[in-house]
Design a protein with these regions (language model features):
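Feature captures the catalytic ectodomains and active-site-proximal regions of enzymes
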Residues: 1-181
Length: 181
């Protein structure tokens, strides 16, 4: 692989997936999504999934940018079976001008790190957490997709909607849902 460019960027967006990923695909701030596309936006206090319309937000974004003529795909991988299916159907990705792939595992792992005792035991410190993440990647269908993209000389942009920070002494803060407004 050839790393052409690496840069660190920051944002004023809250890092919660609901805000970060929806904004990423929509190309809009959360308040703008709520105004322009209320059918795709759920507020914090609303029930139901908060990231169910990423594909629709992406499509609207491409249209706004004058790129609706592009052939593109959107895939959200939430388990190993879906990842393997994507690898099997890689030939279809080659036909597109752009492919957007959401891979949820590392996000799920970071949440599990605080919620599941077994993950806390496996990844007690930053070094162990990185090792666990690298081990997962080395054995995941995602690496197969990256290798196939490299073999096909496809351009690949890897990004994230937010990061994670290990806190040594976590404190749970409880309050009404509108405490911060």
């Amino acid at each position: 692989f050839i790393k052409e460019k690496e840069e660190i960027v920051f944002s004023i967006l809250p890092t919660a997936t609901q805000y970060a990923r929806n904004s990423f695909f929509a190309g809009l701030m959360p308040s703008e999504i709520a105004k322009k596309y209320p059918q795709y936006w759920k507020n914090e206090e609303d029930d139901g999934g908060k990231n169910l319309f990423e594909k629709e937000l992406l499509e609207a974004n491409l249209k706004r940018l004058g790129k609706s003529n592009l052939r593109w795909s959107y895939n959200k991988i939430t388990n190993v079976a879906a990842g393997k299916k994507l690898v099997e159907q890689f030939h279809k990705l080659k036909e597109n001008d752009m492919n957007f792939l959401v891979y949820n595992f590392v996000d799920m792992l970071s949440h599990a790190r605080t919620e599941m005792e077994v993950i806390r035991e496996l990844a007690d410190d930053e070094s162990a957490y990185r090792s666990l993440t690298i081990s997962w990647l080395e054995h995941s269908p995602l690496l197969d997709v990256i290798k196939k993209a490299s073999e096909e000389k496809m351009n690949l942009v890897i990004t994230t909607d937010h990061g994670t920070i290990k806190v040594n002494q976590p404190v749970k803060i409880a309050g009404e849902r509108n405490t911060n407004t």
